[in-house]
């Protein structure tokens, strides 16, 4: 799996700036429940072809009386679940008592730690890092996060020190699970019924292996079989004993969710019907869309709602999830089992759509019909031309469209084409990505050369104009 890198340090040393440089995002996932994450940011970055997950732990306190008292418990949890730690210090202020306490705490963790000296722009790097050798965390690495200097070299250095073996657990899982098994990640906010749903699915089917260690620290991979087809459920909340299925709060980790989506073929996103779609739900949906995984929506706790309440919930879903019209919605009760059995069929259809072969002749026919029904707009008096299309990838399906001036194609027209391809090909349950490529004009910048006959005709016309 992707390595998890935690950014640790005192307040105002530049952790958030470095986070934004590494991920080019400010996305924060907030859990509205006491004791859960409130101030951490999560993002995904990539160096070359190697992705990684970054956690910004926020300020860890400036109290020299003791690190344990100054640290937030959630920041400690982030350090605990990280595979590597970037310890940021301020190169302008030099090491402080709090830095020394933090360094001592990190040394006890037994994890790879890189000492990163930020704010070294405009100063001699050797002088800026000299005092930090006393922290006992190896060679300090100077950067200037605000200007992006030294960050590429830093990440090359960090990832070189992390073995590719982070993917070995996933590979081992593929050996253990049944051949061709569909991996389903059950994700959602705390207390929406994820574990109840997992246990309901397992209670209805024959469990081949009940408890298999997963690739994430608390997620569990559970193979099962239904109608002769193998599946693997990924429970991001961790497997519970049956006596504890009714816990009031499920364990919640963004890291688990991101890793589960990476390992899965299809994601079942569980939403609490009684609370509707929250901001945290939309953040999770954003992560699913970014991952490109096929998606099924499970609207849980449907039982007990009156007819009016159900209509209100459906109206809210239509209003807030207009961008998610490709995902099938299933109204279920994980506690009582109503509607749960239909989820497997929805998963199969979504995965089939995500993996489908899209013949080029059919794509070109659909493109031609779409352009004939609604032509692209004019740009500076010239019509944007879409020439041909072909498949560029699967899971999610990628359709590559070639033409001229495609960079100027409006977003509304791109969405129109996406809807046309989805409807015509029945690609529901999976995101569809369109890529537009402009063909180079070999005659650009060249003037047509006139033939001798054309030159004589031009001279005659010029003489007539002069008269």
From Swiss-Prot:
SUPFAM superfamilies: P-loop containing nucleoside triphosphate hydrolases. Residues 356-440 form the KH-like domain. Associates with the 50S ribosomal subunit. Transmembrane segments: none annotated. CDD domains: EngA1 (cd01894), EngA2 (cd01895). Residues 439-467 are annotated as: Disordered. GO terms for biological process: ribosome biogenesis. This is GTPase Der. The keyword Secreted does not apply. Belongs to the TRAFAC class TrmE-Era-EngA-EngB-Septin-like GTPase superfamily. EngA (Der) GTPase family. It holds the Pfam family KH_dom-like. It comes from the Bacteria. Residues 448-467 have a biased composition (Basic residues). Keywords: GTP-binding, Nucleotide-binding, Repeat, Ribosome biogenesis. GO terms for molecular function: GTP binding; ribosome binding. InterPro entries: G_ENGA, GTP-bd, GTPase_Der, KH_dom-like, KH_dom-like_a/b, P-loop_NTPase, Small_GTP-bd. NCBIfam families: GTPase_EngA, small_GTP. Residues 3-166, 182-355 form the EngA-type G domain. GTP 2 binds at residues 188-195, 235-239, 300-303. GTP 1 binds at residues 9-16, 56-60, 118-121. PROSITE patterns: G_ENGA. GTPase that plays an essential role in the late steps of ribosome biogenesis.
């Amino acid at each position: 799996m992707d390595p998890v890198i935690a950014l640790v340090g005192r307040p105002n040393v530049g952790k958030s700036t470095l986070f934004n440089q590494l991920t080019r995002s400010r996305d924060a996932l907030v859990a509205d429940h006491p004791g859960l994450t409130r101030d951490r940011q999560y993002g995904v970055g990539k160096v070359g072809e190697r992705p990684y997950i970054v956690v910004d732990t926020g300020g860890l306190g400036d109290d020299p009386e003791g690190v344990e008292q100054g640290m937030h418990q959630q920041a400690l949890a982030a350090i605990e679940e990280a595979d590597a730690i970037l310890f940021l210090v301020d190169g302008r202020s030099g090491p402080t008592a709090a830095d020394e306490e933090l360094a001592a705490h990190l040394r006890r963790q037994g994890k790879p730690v890189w000492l990163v000296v930020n704010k070294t722009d405009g100063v001699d790097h050797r002088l800026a890092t000299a005092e930090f050798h006393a922290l006992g965390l190896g060679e300090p690495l100077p950067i200037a996060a605000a200007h992006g200097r030294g960050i590429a070299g830093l990440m090359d250095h960090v990832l070189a020190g992390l073995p590719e073996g982070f993917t070995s657990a996933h590979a081992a899982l593929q050996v253990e699970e049944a051949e061709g098994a569909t991996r389903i990640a059950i994700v959602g906010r705390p207390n929406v019924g994820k574990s109840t749903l997992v246990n309901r699915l397992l209670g209805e089917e024959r469990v081949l292996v009940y408890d298999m260690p997963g690739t994430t620290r608390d997620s569990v991979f559970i193979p099962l079989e239904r109608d002769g087809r193998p599946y693997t459920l990924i429970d991001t909340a961790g497997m519970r004993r049956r006596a504890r299925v009714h816990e009031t709060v499920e364990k919640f980790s963004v890291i688990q969710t991101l890793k589960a989506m990476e390992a899965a073929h299809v994601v079942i996103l569980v939403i609490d019907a009684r609370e509707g779609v929250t901001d945290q739900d939309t953040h999770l949906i954003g992560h699913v869309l970014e991952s490109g995984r096929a998606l099924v929506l499970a609207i849980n706790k449907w039982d007990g709602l009156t007819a009016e309440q159900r209509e209100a919930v459906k109206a809210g879903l239509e209003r807030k999830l207009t961008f998610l019209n490709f995902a099938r919605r299933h109204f279920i009760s994980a506690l009582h089992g109503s509607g749960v059995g239909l989820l497997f069929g929805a998963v199969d259809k979504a995965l089939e759509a995500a993996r489908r072969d899209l013949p080029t002749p059919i794509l070109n026919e659909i493109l031609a019909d779409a352009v004939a029904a609604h032509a692209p707009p004019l740009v500076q008096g010239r019509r944007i031309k879409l020439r041909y299309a072909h498949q560029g990838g699967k899971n999610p399906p990628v359709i590559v469209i070639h033409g001229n001036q495609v960079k100027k194609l409006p977003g509304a027209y791109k969405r129109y084409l996406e809807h046309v391809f989805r409807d015509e090909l029945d690609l529901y349950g999976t995101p569809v990505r369109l890529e537009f490529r402009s063909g180079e004009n070999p005659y650009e910048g060249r003037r047509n050369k006139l033939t001798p006959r054309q030159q004589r005709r031009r001279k005659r016309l010029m003489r007539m104009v002069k008269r």
